[in-house]
Curated annotation (Swiss-Prot):
Subunit structure as annotated in this protein's UniProt entry: Heterooligomer composed of large and small subunits.
Listed name of the protein: Exodeoxyribonuclease 7 small subunit
Function: Bidirectionally degrades single-stranded DNA into large acid-insoluble oligonucleotides, which are then degraded further into small acid-soluble oligonucleotides.
Subcellular location, record wording: Cytoplasm
The keyword RNA-binding belongs to this UniProt entry's keyword annotation: no
Similarity field: Belongs to the XseB family.
Keyword annotations of the record: Cytoplasm, Exonuclease, Hydrolase, Nuclease
Enzyme nomenclature, EC number: 3.1.11.6
C-alpha cells in the first residue's frame, strides 16, 4: 500500500507542477502570486526528483539481490 501511495504522491506532485507551469506561462498572476507559485514549483520539483532517485535506488537493489545480475545504473534512455 505504501508503494501505491508513493506512486500517487509522485503523480500528484507532477500534475500539480504541470498546473503551476501553465498558470505561470499564462502571465495572469501578480508578481507575488508568481513568486509563490515559483517557490511551490521548486518544492514540487525537489519532491519529484527525490521520488525518482528512490526509484532508481530500488531498481539497483533489486538487481543486486539476484545472484546472476550485477547492479547496473538505471538508464531512462532506451538503447536504439
Amino acid at each position: 500500500m505504501a508503494r501505491k501511495k508513493a506512486s500517487l504522491d509522485f503523480e500528484q506532485s507532477l500534475a500539480d507542477l504541470q498546473a503551476l507551469v501553465e498558470r505561470l506561462e499564462n502571465g495572469e498572476l501578480s508578481l507575488e502570486e508568481s513568486l509563490a507559485a515559483f517557490e511551490q514549483g521548486i518544492a514540487l520539483t525537489r519532491d519529484c526528483q527525490g521520488a525518482l532517485a528512490q526509484a532508481e535506488q530500488k531498481v539497483q537493489i533489486l538487481l543486486e539481490r539476484d545472484g546472476e545480475l550485477a547492479a547496473q545504473p538505471f538508464d531512462a534512455e532506451p538503447d536504439v
